[in-house]
Amino acid sequence: MKNTTHLILGMLALTFGMEVKAQIQLPSVFSDGMVLQQNSKVAVWGWGNPSETLMILSEWNPGDTVRTVVDNQGRWKAEVPTGRAGGPYTLEVKGGNDSRKLSDVMLGEVWLCSGQSNMEWSADMGIMNGEQEVKQAACPSVRIFHNPKQGADTPQTDCRTKWEVATPESMRKTSATAYFFARYLTEHLKVPVGILVSAWGGTPAEVWTPADIVEKDEILSKNKLKDYPWWPIKPGVLYNQMIHPLVPYQIAGCIWYQGESNHENAPSYARLVSKMVEAWRKDFGWDFPFYYVQIAPHTYGAKNNTPALLREQQELMLGQVKNTAMINISDLVENVKDIHPRNKRAIGERLACLAMDKVYGQFTGAYESPRLASAELQKGKIVVNLEGNFSTLQSTTPHITGLVLTDGKGDTLTVKAKIKGKQIILPVRKLNPPYRVSYCFDEATIGSLRTEAGMPVLPFCTKPIEKQ
C-alpha cells in the first residue's frame, strides 16, 4: 500500500512538473507596467514547451503577429517591432494551450542604471530636500525595475522583482540619481521612461564584469581587490545576477556611478571598465551610450594619491571607449567627509542633460566640464590651455583654489595666475624647469574654476613642462 501511494504521488509530481514546464513563462523583466524601447525591434523571450509555436501579439501593432518556435531546451526568443512612444498597451504571448498577457505596457525610452552606493542611494537613505521630493514623486510616465541586491556564481536567467510606476513609495526605495534622470527625460522628451536599476553599495567594478574577463587578463587578475567581508568582491558575481538576467532587453543607454571602491587599484581602472563596457555591449547587441559620473572630492585618507589617479583613469576612458561621456560633480559637494553627495537631483539631471544632448539632440542645460588640452612654457610664463564647449573660464574665489605649480626641485611655487578665455597663465620668475601644473589633483580639494555656465573644470596634472 505504501509503495502504491509513493508511485501515485511520484506520477502526480511528474505530471505536475511536466505541466509547469509546458507553461509559457516570461522573465520578470517582462511584467505589467513595463517600458519597451520605442521605434525599435525589441527582444522578447522566455520558456515553454519544446517545439511549440508561439504567437506574440502587440496592441500597438495589431496587424503584425510575430511567431516563434520553442527550442529543444524549452527556450524561445522573438523580435517584436515597436512604434512611437505611447501606451498603455497589452502584449500577449499565446501557445496552443496557454497564454501570458501583460497590461499597462508603455513604449518609450529605457536606460540601465548601475554602480555602487552613489547609484544605489535612495531618498530613504537621505537626499537633499528628500521629504519634498518624495511627496512630488507621483510620476506615472516613469517606470522602475529595481533589481534586488543578490549575487550568483554563474550567469542567471531571471531575477525576482517587477516593474513599478513611480510613486512616493516606489521612488523613495530606489536609486535617487536614476529616478531624477528618468524624470528629467520624461519631462523634456514627453515620452515614458523606464529605468533598470542594478546597483549595490561598496562594490568594485570587478563584480559587475564577467569573471572570465577579469581572470584571463593578466593585469586585471593581478590587480583585483582582495576579499572584503561586508559586500561582494568576487569577479562576476553581480554581473551574473543583476545584469545577465536583463540581457538582451533593448535599452537606449546606460548611466554608471561607481569608482570609489576601486581607488586602491586605480592604475587598471580604465582597462577594467573598458572591458566591462565591451562585454555589456556584446550582450545587449549594440554599442549603446555609456555615461558616467567622475568620483567626487572626498577625504579617503588614502595612500599614494589614489583617488586622484582614479579620476584620471575615468577621464582616460573617454579616449579609449567610443560613445562614452562623463560628468564632474565637484561643485555639488557640500561635505568632503561624506562620500555620498546628497544633491542627487542635480546629479541625475546633469546626466540627463548629457543624454538629452548626445542621444536626443536637444540641448537643455549645461553638463560638460573643460579638460586639459596642453601646457607650455612661453617667455617666462606657463600657459595652460583647456578645451571643451565653453567660451571663458572664471574663478569663484580671488585666487584660483586647487591650482598648484611645482618646479624641478619639487618645490611648490606661489604665483598669481590669470585667466584669459580658455587659458590659465602662470608667471615664472626664476626658471627652474621642469614644471608641473596641477588642479585639484588630490583627494578632496574642491576647485574654484568654472565655465560661464557654472560647470567645474576637470582635475588634471600636466606632464613635465620645460621647453620654451
Locations of regions flagged by a protein language model:
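Cell-envelope and extracellular/periplasmic
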Residues: 23-468
